Curated annotation (Swiss-Prot):
<dbReference type="GO" id="GO:0016757">
    <property type="term" value="F:glycosyltransferase activity"/>
</dbReference>
<dbReference type="InterPro" id="IPR007184">
    <property type="entry name" value="Mannoside_phosphorylase"/>
</dbReference>
<feature type="binding site">
    <location>
        <position position="31"/>
    </location>
    <ligand>
        <name>beta-D-Manp-(1-&gt;2)-beta-D-Manp-(1-&gt;2)-D-Manp</name>
    </ligand>
</feature>
<protein>
    <recommendedName>
        <fullName>Beta-1,2-mannobiose phosphorylase</fullName>
        <ecNumber>2.4.1.339</ecNumber>
    </recommendedName>
</protein>
<feature type="binding site">
    <location>
        <position position="188"/>
    </location>
    <ligand>
        <name>beta-D-Manp-(1-&gt;2)-beta-D-Manp-(1-&gt;2)-D-Manp</name>
    </ligand>
</feature>
<feature type="binding site">
    <location>
        <begin position="140"/>
        <end position="141"/>
    </location>
    <ligand>
        <name>beta-D-Manp-(1-&gt;2)-beta-D-Manp-(1-&gt;2)-D-Manp</name>
    </ligand>
</feature>
<dbReference type="InterPro" id="IPR023296">
    <property type="entry name" value="Glyco_hydro_beta-prop_sf"/>
</dbReference>
<feature type="binding site">
    <location>
        <position position="46"/>
    </location>
    <ligand>
        <name>beta-D-Manp-(1-&gt;2)-beta-D-Manp-(1-&gt;2)-D-Manp</name>
    </ligand>
</feature>
<comment type="function">
    <text>Catalyzes the reversible phosphorolysis of 1,2-beta-oligomannan. In phosphorolytic reactions, prefers beta-1,2-mannobiose (beta-1,2-Man2) as substrate, but can also use beta-1,2-mannotriose.</text>
</comment>
<feature type="binding site">
    <location>
        <position position="273"/>
    </location>
    <ligand>
        <name>beta-D-Manp-(1-&gt;2)-beta-D-Manp-(1-&gt;2)-D-Manp</name>
    </ligand>
</feature>
<feature type="binding site">
    <location>
        <position position="333"/>
    </location>
    <ligand>
        <name>beta-D-Manp-(1-&gt;2)-beta-D-Manp-(1-&gt;2)-D-Manp</name>
    </ligand>
</feature>
<dbReference type="Pfam" id="PF04041">
    <property type="entry name" value="Glyco_hydro_130"/>
</dbReference>
<keyword id="KW-0808">Transferase</keyword>
<comment type="similarity">
    <text>Belongs to the glycosyl hydrolase 130 family.</text>
</comment>
<comment type="subunit">
    <text>Homodimer.</text>
</comment>
<keyword id="KW-0328">Glycosyltransferase</keyword>
<feature type="binding site">
    <location>
        <position position="89"/>
    </location>
    <ligand>
        <name>beta-D-Manp-(1-&gt;2)-beta-D-Manp-(1-&gt;2)-D-Manp</name>
    </ligand>
</feature>
Amino acid sequence: MNIYRYEENPLITPLDVKPIHEGFEVIGAFNGGVAEYNGEVLLLLRVAEKPVSEDPEIVLAPVYNAKNKELELQSFRLDDENYDFEDPRMIRSKAKLEGFSYLTSLSYIRIARSKDGHHFTLDEKPFLYPFNEYQTFGIEDARVTQIGDTYHVNFSAVSEFGVADALVTTKDFENLEYQGNIFAPENKDVLIFPEKINGKYYALHRPSLKSIGNLDIWIASSPDLRSFGDHRHLLGIRPGEYDSGRVGGGCVPIKTEEGWLILYHGATEENRYVMGAALLDLNDPTIVLKRTKTPILEPVADYEKNGFFGDVVFACGAIQEGDTLHMYYGVADTSMAGCDMKISEILHQLEVEAK
C-alpha cells in the first residue's frame, strides 16, 4: 500500500508549544483528535507539561485540585523506598501491584489550526483543561465525531479514581457543554460512530482489565450518546501478530460502500505501536467482516522510532477527501505527524488478506 508521509513531518513538536504553566516544560504535543471547521483543519492536541524540579533528587507530580480549582505539586524523593521511579512517566507505589499513584506530567487539550493541513498555528489557551475531580491527573487523547452541526469530543479523564472516558459537545470549538463520563474506569480509546445505525448510536471502547482477559476492543450502543449498553466483544489481540499485546480504537469509523472502516492501533508485548484496519458490517457493526494481517502504518521514520516513548504511531483522527484519507497521528509519544493513504487501497488490503 502506498503511504505519503508529509514532507513537513513532524508537523508539531514540543518545541513548538509554549507551556501555560510557569516552571513547566512541554514534553509532548501528540495524539491529536481531528476535525474540519470553518475552512480549517483542527488538531485537538494532547499537550503534556512537566514541572521542572530544581533538585535532581526530587520528582514532582502535578495534581489538579478540583475543590480550589488550582494546580498543586506533590514532591517525592528518589530515595523514598515506598515508591518506584523507574518509568519516567509515572510514580508507582510499591504497595500497589499494578497501576500508578501519580503522573509526572499533566495533559490537557490545545487546538492547532491549519488552512492547508500541513502548517499549523497553535491557540495560546487550552481548549480543554481539567475542571473536575475525574480529571485531576489530566485530560488525554481526544477524538472528535461530527454529527450534524455538533462536534462530540470525547477524551480520557484521568484521576485517582482511574481512567474514564468523558464527553463534551460544541458547535464552534469555543462554547462547550459537558455531558459527563460516558464510560466508567477503566476504559479508554472510545470512538463514536458518526451516525445512527438502525436507530441506535454506537461506540467502540477498550476496557483495561486487571484480573483476566486481554486489552481488546468492545462495542456498545446508546439511544442518546450518554447511556451506553449492550456491550459486546469485537476485536481481540492476536498472538504472534502485530497486535499481540493490545488493541484500541484509533480514528472515528469511516462509512464505505463495503462496510464501516475501522483504523485501530495494535501493539506487541514489547509496546511497538502500529495502525491496523478492520471492516464492520454496515447495518450491524457488531459483525467483523475483515481484518488486516499486516499493518497499514508502522514506525519506520526517525521521528516515529525515537522520542519520549519510541516505536509508536498512534492515530486519533483523519479527514476523508474522496478516496484520500488524510491521517494525523502521534509519534513516539512526543510529536504529531501526518500522512495520506487511499481508502480503496486499505479496502483492497483487507480483501487480499481475508483470503
